[in-house]
């Protein structure tokens, strides 16, 4: 819990942009999650710096979320301060050609921006949900193409240094759905992407193709968190889950999708406990049936049950 003194500090710094006991089900793509002690939405870098300083001084646990994809928030909620950078929406074309985007810009906005200008390189990201900050931290991608292939540099701040530091991505260690090499408490605030000059028609054609494919192969009409498990080397988590006979498996309001078995959908009223039960069931059944131990891609956030 956050004491009254810390609450006053947060309100003084952010005003109405901090909410207490904020239900996280309203801020995650799965529409699941108990309350955060505080949900803070800084308007700019100055407010973010003030917020990080308060968290440091008051020893408040902090959690960064983007658009709420790729995370499962516990039914008991999240301790401390949840920070969302959705007001960090700067987006502009720069020489190179490159595109500068702040952490709160949505993936779809960047894709549209590049398409309109005939800039090629980000087509693979079409339809991948989330925000720039989240993509970079997750090294989001599809097939052999990931964020590390287009991100030239990124900007971040820390609790100890609230002045933005720029780091070349070539100096960082990108892995499968992860980024290593930044300070543990780093908050990504921007990224610069290296692109190529193409034509609007060519870029749009590829974007449309990928969007059509995703629409046909993913359950986009129900709340989900995206891929639940990482793909094992040389195989696909969805194929293994389907082979284990788990398509359509339900616990409470949660279901392993029959459209794409690596998605768990909230059909209405699902709890985090329901999703966790399906995750454990899938891991057990796939291990028994296929001899493969699945690793989660979705991040489990909040108070343990």
Language model features with spans:
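Short, flexible micro-motifs
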Residues: 36, 69-73, 107, 133-137, ...
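Short, basic and Ser/Thr-rich N-terminal targeting/leader segments
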Residues: 58, 65-67, 150, 222-223, ...
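A generic local secondary-structure boundary/capping motif
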Residues: 70-71, 111-114, 122-126, 136-146, ...
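Phosphate/pyrophosphate- and phosphate-bearing ligand-binding catalytic cores of soluble enzymes
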Residues: 19-20, 71, 157-277, 281-305
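Structural signature of FAD isoalloxazine-binding scaffolds in flavoprotein oxidoreductases
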Residues: 33-34, 40-45, 72-90, 136-170, ...
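Short clusters of hydrophobic/aromatic residues that line enzyme substrate/ligand-binding pockets
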Residues: 18, 24, 30, 91, ...
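Anion-binding (especially nucleotide phosphate/pyrophosphate-binding) glycine-rich loop
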Residues: 2-132
């Amino acid at each position: 819990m956050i004491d009254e003194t810390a609450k006053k500090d947060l309100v003084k710094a952010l005003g109405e942009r901090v909410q207490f006991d904020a239900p996280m089900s309203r801020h995650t793509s799965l529409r699941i999650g108990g309350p955060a002690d505080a949900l803070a939405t800084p308007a700019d870098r100055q407010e973010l710096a003030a917020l990080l300083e308060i968290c440091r001084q008051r020893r408040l646990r902090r959690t960064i979320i983007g658009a709420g994809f790729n995370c499962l928030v516990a039914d008991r909620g999240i301790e401390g301060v949840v920070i969302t950078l959705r007001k960090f929406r700067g987006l502009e074309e720069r020489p190179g050609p490159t595109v500068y985007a702040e952490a709160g810009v949505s993936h779809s906005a960047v894709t549209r921006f590049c398409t309109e200008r005939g800039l090629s390189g980000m087509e693979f990201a079409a339809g991948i949900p989330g925000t720039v900050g989240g993509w970079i931290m997750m090294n989001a991608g599809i097939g052999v193409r990931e964020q590390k292939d287009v991100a030239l540099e990124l900007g971040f701040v820390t609790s100890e240094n609230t002045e933005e530091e720029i780091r070349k991505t070539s100096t960082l260690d990108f892995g499968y759905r992860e980024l290593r090499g930044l300070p543990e408490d780093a908050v990504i605030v921007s990224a610069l992407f290296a692109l190529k000059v193409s034509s609007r028609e060519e870029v749009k054609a590829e974007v449309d193709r990928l969007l059509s494919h995703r629409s046909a192969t993913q359950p986009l009409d129900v709340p989900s968190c995206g891929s639940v498990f990482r793909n094992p080397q040389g195989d696909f988590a969805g194929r293994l889950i389907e082979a284990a006979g788990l398509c359509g498996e339900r616990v409470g309001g949660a279901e392993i999708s029959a459209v794409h078995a690596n998605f768990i959908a909230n059909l209405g009223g699902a709890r985090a406990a329901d999703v966790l039960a399906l995750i454990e069931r899938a891991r057990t059944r796939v291990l028994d049936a296929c001899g493969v131990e699945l690793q989660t891609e979705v991040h489990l956030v909040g108070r343990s049950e």
